[in-house]
Amino acid sequence: MQEHWANLNGLKIRYLESGKGNDKHILFIHGLGSSADRWVGIPKSLSANFHTISLDLPGFGESDKPASMNYTIENFSDIVIDFMNLLAINDGKTSIVGHSLGGYIAAEVTILHKIQVERLVLIDSSGMLEKPTALLEEYLSVAMNPTTDKVRNIFEQMVTDSTKIPLKLVESFIKRINLPNAKYAFKSTLENSTNTQLERERLKLIDGIPTLIIWGNEDKVIPVEHSDLFKESISNSHVEIIQDAGHAPFTEKPEQVFELIRNFLT
């Protein structure tokens, strides 16, 4: 994957790209507190047949983190749409893969600009939470005062296999959350994304876009029952439950999730 930077009206956005020249595109949108690097090689593996792009959302990873920004789903969605326009992946041949917060944003982008989206993949997506779950509240507390032990502990609660939490991941999170304005961006994003919901009627606007819903059966961040809420609201959708996986099944069962995404998008 090649690292690039996009300039969106003065906002610097970092992204990773592979497979440029392929006719169809896949845009990967990460979750809260994560980055473009967290997709464990799936974008690279798919780049044999697709032009794949994973971005650092503003406020996260290495992208800019303006203190003046209100980190709402609406603002994230507008930025993603501007990003798609800038990279000329707005030709209706782009599929979007969103995890957690990224799933909420991906759904909103699809609703607002349906003509630009070919297929949609939602992985343990937020958007249906009426309030933060206990684990999300703990995640916020840890992010505001991170230590190696605290971060490792919260990450281990999000997976079924603690060996999937390498020290490098913990250290990377601590480094990035201590960057200027990163804690504000994290808190603002969490509050905004859990104080608003994707209404069922609004989700129905995705109708006609083939949608794959993937969920870890042991998700303690957003319970697996939420997969049914999305399926019931999006007519052309189906659900795949990943056994023995938590909130980020693509990190615990990468081969299985890769196959599901590849088969769905091919």
Language model features with spans:
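Conserved alpha/beta-hydrolase catalytic His-Asp/Glu region
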Residues: 13, 130-133, 146-208
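Acidic catalytic loop of the alpha/beta-hydrolase fold
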Residues: 218-222
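Conserved HGGG/HGGXW glycine-rich cap/lid loop of the alpha/beta-hydrolase fold
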Residues: 11, 16-62
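Flexible "cap/lid" loop of the alpha/beta hydrolase fold
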Residues: 107-111, 118-148
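Catalytic active-site module of serine/aspartate enzymes centered on a nucleophile-bearing elbow/loop
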Residues: 237-266
